[in-house]
Amino acid sequence: MHPLPSVALLSAIGAVAAQVGPWGQCGGRSYTGETSCVSGWSCVLFNEWYSQCQPATTTSTSSVSATAAPSSTSSSKESVPSATTSKKPVPTGSSSFVKADGLKFNIDGETKYFAGTNAYWLPFLTNDADVDSVMDNLQKAGLKILRTWGFNDVNSKPSSGTVYFQLHDPSTGTTTINTGADGLQRLDYVVSAAEKRGIKLLIPLVNNWDDYGGMNAYVKAYGGSKTEWYTNSKIQSVYQAYIKAVVSRYRDSPAIMAWELSNEARCQGCSTDVIYNWTAKTSAYIKSLDPNHMVATGDEGMGVTVDSDGSYPYSTYEGSDFAKNLAAPDIDFGVFHLYTEDWGIKDNSWGNGWVTSHAKVCKAAGKPCLFEEYGLKDDHCSASLTWQKTSVSSGMAADLFWQYGQTLSTGPSPNDHFTIYYGTSDWQCGVADHLSTL
């Protein structure tokens, strides 16, 4: 990691307002700022989405680093692909942004019920042909929406060839955003592939869980606890620096359906004000960077009072109040998840009431509702089919089953027992039959 610019250098940069300072963004498809770097620095192309001011004599660079402090100062290092290898084909798919239209979504000029899926692992593939194959199959099936991870946080640099998006270093108290070939360029390819096929992406920006680092990766580098993550000023400044890097990168892409603040945010034992205040602040920040795309919470939908049976998911035990969070001014639609087995619910038909409860809250708020994750381990059809029918009849805007699977060049995609593999008998009863009714 290069050292941060000196005070003298920063002062010199401030005197040249029309030029970009060291390691600053100087180009890219979504970029509208200055393109000229300060003396001694050159604007270097990473890919069609991102160019950065690098030392004029540098032949290789690395990832963009953000300090924990709210300062905009940053450092970087990472291998820069040549313009010929990093340039992606010009997308030819749909060109309109997804919008809310009453209690439904308008996608490519159509306001109706949509179906989709989750494939969290897609940006972590290193073979472009595998990404293309997944997108081709989704397009053939008629699955219009894909939710995939926009985060991958580590506390130490992984082995060569392993994809990661951010390195939170506990030894230095710094965070490095990886914009290289094993970093955000993998997400670049997913976005580009989705654009060409008219697939719309939902992208959460941090994980509540420790998979792929999550909030605890920040805590390990900056201290505090997971429940303090939402209010820790150092952590939030680093989180917002990452938001800015990703959201600005794809601000003009029609492939993005919406940004999600997190995947399944929880703050066990906290006042619901903690998550609400963070939701309101962060969603407003995203909208200030990107007015083109919608914003959602990405949460499980816990803390519902409408038709509550008093069970764990309806409670605010995890610090979340669904209606309260949905009411945040810059949240465009509601999302919720359904996992009866994981929540200790014995009767799968309970899920139908869970769906209709959320539909009622969304209707009262005047915002669409997305049945964002649902599934059963191994038994992929019995209850899921009923949940899907309830989703359609209750006025939901769309549903996304968890999760999509297929054979890749390296073998089967991840199987967490919820996975429904493309072309199998479970695919027919759990996915194709549902799509045929829409």
Swiss-Prot record:
Endo-1,4-mannanase, a crucial enzyme for depolymerization of seed galactomannans and wood galactoglucomannans. It comes from the Eukaryota. Optimum temperature is 65 degrees Celsius. Stable up to 55 degrees Celsius. Residues 1-17 form the signal peptide. Residues 61-92 are annotated as: Disordered. It is an enzyme of class 3 (hydrolase). SUPFAM superfamilies: (Trans)glycosidases, Cellulose-binding domain. Optimum pH is 4.0 to 5.0. Residues 61-86 have a biased composition (Low complexity). This is Mannan endo-1,4-beta-mannosidase F. GO terms for biological process: mannan catabolic process. Has a modular structure: a carbohydrate-binding module (CBM) at the N-terminus, a linker rich in serines, and a C-terminal endo-1,4-mannanase catalytic module. The genes for catalytic modules and CBMs seem to have evolved separately and have been linked by gene fusion. Residues 19-54 form the CBM1 domain. Keywords: Carbohydrate metabolism, Glycoprotein, Glycosidase, Hydrolase, Secreted, Signal.
